[in-house]
Curated annotation (Swiss-Prot):
Site-specific mutations that are activating (168-Val) or dominant negative (173-Asn or 280-Tyr) in ras-like proteins do not have the same phenotype in this protein family. Residues 335-345 have a biased composition (Acidic residues). Induction: Constitutively expressed (at protein level). The gene is cgtA. GO terms for biological process: ribosome biogenesis. GTP binds at residues 166-173, 191-195, 213-216, 280-283, 309-311. This is GTPase Obg/CgtA. The lineage of its organism: Bacteria, Pseudomonadati, Pseudomonadota, Alphaproteobacteria, Caulobacterales. Belongs to the TRAFAC class OBG-HflX-like GTPase superfamily. OBG GTPase family.
Amino acid sequence: MKFLDQCKIYIRSGNGGGGSVSFRREKYIEYGGPDGGDGGRGGDVWIEAVEGLNTLIDYRYQQHFKAGTGVHGMGRARHGAAGEDVVLKVPVGTEVLEEDKETLIADLDHAGMRLLLAKGGNGGWGNLHFKGPVNQAPKYANPGQEGEERWIWLRLKLIADVGLVGLPNAGKSTFLAAASAAKPKIADYPFTTLTPNLGVVDLSSSERFVLADIPGLIEGASEGAGLGTRFLGHVERSATLIHLIDATQDDVAGAYETIRGELEAYGDELADKAEILALNKIDALDEETLAEKVAELEAVSGIKPRLVSGVSGQGVTELLRAAYKQVRIRRGDLEEEIDDDEDHVDETPGGWTP
């Protein structure tokens, strides 16, 4: 299934049906009174977050959605039926924004959440409503009210407990494959990952969380370089970030500073989120070179990096357990405390909430 995380759509609620101008006509009743029924109300446009979806791809092929028009009223005081509603099904984590793409209308962050986007027009009154002592045979009725129309943006931010960030070719997809049953595309060239991948990490039967791998960032991504920072929105909701750095590259300190700079440029307090720093691909280095890389990275970050290898699996479980601890803190299952992991985790979340 192709991945699409934002789209612009047009919605319009239904017009109300017009009221009827009608008079009672029966045998032996020469002057029957008015009996025009009311028009039905127009259909509404709703949006609902549902489970089982992780893309907005359906809205690439259809961008216009119109609810049904109310049926006109009829004689014998028969009211028109209401127009059919339109319900837009979207993944959990979808944000609804105004046409300016900045004003947030709603954040559908849990399954079953439902929002009225456009209310249908009321049906018009039939002439039965206008009968009075002065005018006992009104020959007019109300037309139905117009429906509402608007353009809106849908933006998906995946619901993940832990986010993977790093430069292209840092080994994020390999790590995701080693940590979960996900099967992301893996190759030895930059930007192999073009869309976010999700994997469920099962530490035990009762310990599990969702891990998100997003496309790699490069210097200048906040200004549009590479794939930009668009996909960072998918880790905004996460409890912590795992920052993977390729231990085989020459400048590990520069790699760290590049990603930190892009996180700060993105905003939304993403740079203040708890971070676990890890040196990946350690199986490709000898002990002396690895020690130099660790010292270099610790000097610039102030954090003692964890050592992992997505290929051999070394250190992966320990890193995942450290990440799960942050998830439990976020869920309220565990109080934040300083322990032996304090050198590995930068815990400065700054009260961030989604």
